[in-house]
Swiss-Prot record:
Residues binding FMN: 10, 16-18, 91-94, 135-138
Protein name per Swiss-Prot or TrEMBL: FMN-dependent NADH:quinone oxidoreductase
Alphabetical UniProt keywords: Flavoprotein, FMN, NAD, Oxidoreductase
Cofactor comment: Binds 1 FMN per subunit.
SUPFAM superfamilies named among the record's database cross-references: Flavoproteins
UniProt enzyme class: oxidoreductase
Top-level taxon of the source organism: Bacteria
GO molecular function, a single term: electron transfer activity
Species in which this protein is naturally found: Vibrio parahaemolyticus serotype O3:K6 (strain RIMD 2210633)
Cofactor(s) annotated in UniProt: FMN
Documented EC number(s): 1.6.5.-, 1.7.1.17
Membrane-spanning parts: none
């Protein structure tokens, strides 16, 4: 694997199964080719009026607005520099963590990572692979309660990342045996991608 951007988004820190799975997966990546961003330990700003205004401004930016644009540019450059994104995406209340959504809101920028054309939206970040490690307390894969998979597939595709693999660690709150099997299944899937 060449250049890797690993995103951790769990609020559980050292107790996070998604973080552990991602950390185990990237342990053999050359450190010079690895960027790790812990979105919970180092939270990004929420998309509010001030952030949205900054990202749409074209001139005469205040110092605060320029800081938002600079942060967004840095996050986008991390994506562009990577060949593979490894995303820890635990399911919280049937969706992704706020921390991961904040990252998405800062990298999905019209005219920068996607553009509108007469034929629809065109993603501008191409040639990347994304591996999404999603952990869940219950069993949600291929069911109406799984909003993580379709959302991330759509939003990553929106910016041009269409080669997306999902790794599922499910049933983590359904007893020790079920949790152990869920982790083991995810580890086996990840081992085939290393």
């Amino acid at each position: 694997m060449s250049r890797v951007l690993a995103l951790k988004s769990s609020i559980l820190g050292d107790y996070s199964q998604s973080n552990k799975l991602v950390e185990d997966f990237i342990k053999n990546v050359d450190q010079d080719k690895l960027t790790v961003r812990d979105l919970a330990a180092n939270p990004l700003p929420v998309l509010d009026f001030a952030v949205a205004t900054a990202l749409r401004a074209t001139e005469d930016l205040s110092q605060e607005q320029q800081a938002v644009v600079d942060l967004s540019d840095t996050l986008i450059e991390e994506v562009k520099a990577a060949d593979t994104l490894v995303i820890a995406a635990p399911m919280y209340n049937f969706t992704i963590p706020t921390q991961l959504k904040n990252w998405i809101d800062l990298i999905a920028r019209a005219g920068v990572t996607f553009k509108y054309t007469e034929n629809g939206v065109q993603g501008l970040i191409e040639g990347k692979k994304a591996i999404v490690v999603t952990t869940r307390g219950g069993i949600h894969k291929d069911s109406p309660t799984d909003n993580v998979t379709p959302y991330l597939r759509t939003v990553l595709g929106f910016v041009g990342i269409t080669d997306v693999e999902f790794i599922y660690a499910e049933a983590l709150n359904m007893g020790e045996d079920a949790a152990s099997k869920g982790i083991s299944d995810a580890q086996s899937q990840l081992a085939t991608m290393a």
